[in-house]
């Protein structure tokens, strides 16, 4: 099994970036490395294929979403097209590339731009008020630098729901993202990935929204309430992970003092998060859903700039999808 796992990891790495010089300076590598783009394809991966009536629930985690990217690329390459995706934060960003059927796109972008301060950095936060540069990441990159297949997203048999946090209600907001080309639903995708403290509030349709992870980190209950019988959940932390209280609550209290319900969710997020992780594990053991998660503690930070760590986490996700593939097929066939 270990040999198979290693082979899958190697394959995942080779498909995304070229080999780097063994003795190159790490900082220089990070600055100059130029990942190869996803394999060019005239058609999205789902073209001419059937979508499977399954809900795919994707946790966030900023750059830890590289694990999810590896899982989803394996799914696309092996013709598993879940027809409903429910994504939180980085999960929503991974989700919209899955919907468009573009294999390798998420990993390619994260690898290529992880050291560009306009993409995701505290430098971007200082200059724009957003750690994730909205103009750069959501406009310049998909519209000019690395064109996104907006038509494929629109035509896809897969639908995406982006999960955000409504500051005034202190509840999760679930929005079907159908139109990115005319920016009709783009604010909801941006809101879902707008981390508190380092992002400006997104105001859309009379709502004030931020990152969905605060109010529903793993939206399994929302998925269950859709009435679906099959649910695949991709997590970005291993089974030993336990979230602790937010050490920045004094700062958050000052910043979001006008939103008491939202503050309560921030204050007790670790309790809800750990409870959800336990619930998901129990449901997986009972065969009520299927979980794919890292097998060891994740060392990638939210704003990771180390390409080697990012690539390794992507390879872990790809390999874990391969390792659990037969079990997943058995679950879906029941």
Task: Outline where the language-model segments fall.
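Patatin-like phospholipase
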Residues: 2-88, 96-334
